[in-house]
A protein has these predicted regions:
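Hydrophobic alpha-helical transmembrane segments in multi-pass membrane proteins
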Residues: 1-96, 159-206, 294, 384-388, ...
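Short internal beta-strands
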Residues: 266, 288-294, 397-402
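Active-site HxH/HxHxD metal-binding segment of metal-dependent hydrolases
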Residues: 270-307
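Cap/insert and terminal regions of metallo-dependent hydrolase folds
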Residues: 360-434
Length: 462
């Protein structure tokens, strides 16, 4: 759209004023597609063009072309930092080098060869094939070089999300630093930017825990946070299409919360809807310990088996495995994790255990089953949540990790009725999105459901 507006302006007025063209293109996009403001591409595209105009306006002076090119490239990376922070919580530190390499490579080598190959096509297919093949080889070399940059250990800078007002102050600082020197507000800009970097992510106090059931469709992914530690219980599904909930949901959530590593990942068992996203989490964050009910089946050498009775304490919060008792397979091998805050409130994560293990828990672990928060066993399947288990746990809140209109019909009506009979409040991720519960000393349980907190008409398409 911006190119079309620019060409029309040239035809109409000859030499259009750049900012007017930019403004007109912005107005046209918003007129044609108002919801484009919800997409990162809209903000990044218009911000990049605005930065180029700002960085090149009245700055030619005595600078050489090389100096102006460097100014624009590094200015773009610096200027787009606020938007990259807001949308992705990460910034590529190698982007200026990649752009300095790719732009002349493509502009002076690849594109001319492509055009020459196309022009030669009617006259000599042999020469055309050679030119087009050469351009393809040059693109392959460029791609290889960019891949080497991408795997550098210092390639990405990741940062937690910050509130809107702080990000606005940071953006103002960036703009002030990029203004022409005569108008520069560098001291104020540096002060604004440094203030944002000193912010610490919000964390629970010692003895408290924050529990997040992430919306990964028909699967399970839970994050448990204490004062100085974080545990991930299951990692959602991955699909043949390439979509991976670890990459799309879990890792971004952890990065947004300011974590650079996971203290412990628990993979309840080896089904895809519980393990599929784990590899993607490993790629983004360091995972210090891995435990599973089926360590051999998940295929990671450093994974150890979760066992009934194993317990530990993080920041005044007590963790204990209630099952598996023996070497089980499939759903019944699931790690059943009990988490107790300092004030005695309990979270129970049973994975996909079924009737037999529930009966065994009722017989052998009855006193420890009582919980305030329960993630329903096996997503609310009729093979789980037997009456004796439901009564033994007696939860105030039951959460069903299910996909919208899933093919299994979870949660099953008879299971829902059992929990309703004991007066439990029920939430499911299909209707509520991500669900967070905060167990904080001296406060009632705080329940935060994403869909209720973020009501927008364009998200109601169901």
């Amino acid at each position: 759209v911006m190119v079309c507006v620019w060409m029309l302006a040239i035809l109409w007025k000859g030499r259009p004023e750049p900012w007017r063209v930019w403004s007109l293109a912005l107005w046209m996009i918003l007129l044609l597609d108002p919801l484009s403001v919800l997409r990162a591409g809209f903000w990044l595209s218009f911000a990049a063009v605005a930065l180029i105009l700002l960085l090149t306006a009245g700055r030619s002076g005595r600078r050489s072309r090389r100096q102006r090119l460097l100014t624009v490239q590094f200015g773009l990376v610096f200027g787009l930092t606020p938007l990259l922070w807001v949308w992705f919580q990460q910034i590529s530190l190698s982007a200026p080098i990649a752009n300095l390499l790719a732009i002349p490579w493509v502009g002076f080598l690849v594109v001319p060869l492509l055009l020459a190959g196309i022009l030669c096509l009617p006259f000599s297919s042999l020469l055309s094939d050679w030119l087009l093949g050469l351009s393809a080889d040059l693109l392959s070399i460029l791609w290889w070089l960019l891949e080497q940059l991408a795997v550098l250990p210092v390639n990405l800078w990741q940062s937690p999300a910050v509130s809107g007002i702080w990000m606005l102050l940071f953006a103002l600082g960036v703009v002030g630093a990029l203004l022409p020197r005569a108008l520069s507000l560098m001291p104020v800009s540096l002060l604004l930017m440094s203030a944002v970097f000193r912010l610490e992510p919000e964390r629970p106090d010692s003895g408290e825990l924050w529990f997040s059931l992430l919306d990964v469709g028909q699967g399970l992914a839970v994050v448990v946070e204490t004062r100085h530690h974080v545990l991930v219980y299951d990692a959602g599904p991955a699909f043949r299409s390439g979509f991976n909930t670890g990459e799309a949901v879990i890792a971004p959530f952890l990065v947004q919360r300011g974590y650079r590593h996971v203290d412990r990942m628990v993979i309840s068992h080896s089904d895809n809807d519980h393990i599929g996203g784990a590899e993607a989490v490993f790629e983004r964050l360091d995972v210090l310990a891995i435990q599973s009910g089926e360590p051999g089946a998940i295929g990671w050498a450093r994974a150890t088996r979760c066992r009934s009775g194993h317990q530990w304490i993080w920041d005044g919060v007590h963790f204990e495995y209630l099952a598996p008792f023996d070497r089980e397979e499939g759903n019944n091998s699931s790690c059943v994790l009990r988490v107790e805050a300092a004030d005695g409130r309990v979270l129970l994560l049973p994975g996909d255990i079924e009737r037999r293990i529930e009966q065994q828990l009722v017989r052998q672990r009855y006193p420890q089953l009582a919980a305030d928060i329960l993630v329903a066993p096996h997503h609310g399947s009729r093979t789980s949540s037997i009456a004796e288990f439901v009564e033994a746990v007696g939860p105030d809140y039951v959460l069903f990790p299910v996909g919208y209109r899933n093919r299994f019909g979870f949660p099953r009506p008879e299971v829902v009725e059992r929990y309703r009979a004991i007066g439990a409040s029920m939430l499911d991720s299909a209707e509520s999105g991500a669900i967070q519960l905060r167990v904080e000393a001296g406060k009632p349980l705080q329940v935060l459901a994403y869909r209720q907190r973020s009501k927008r008409y364009w998200k109601a398409e169901r």
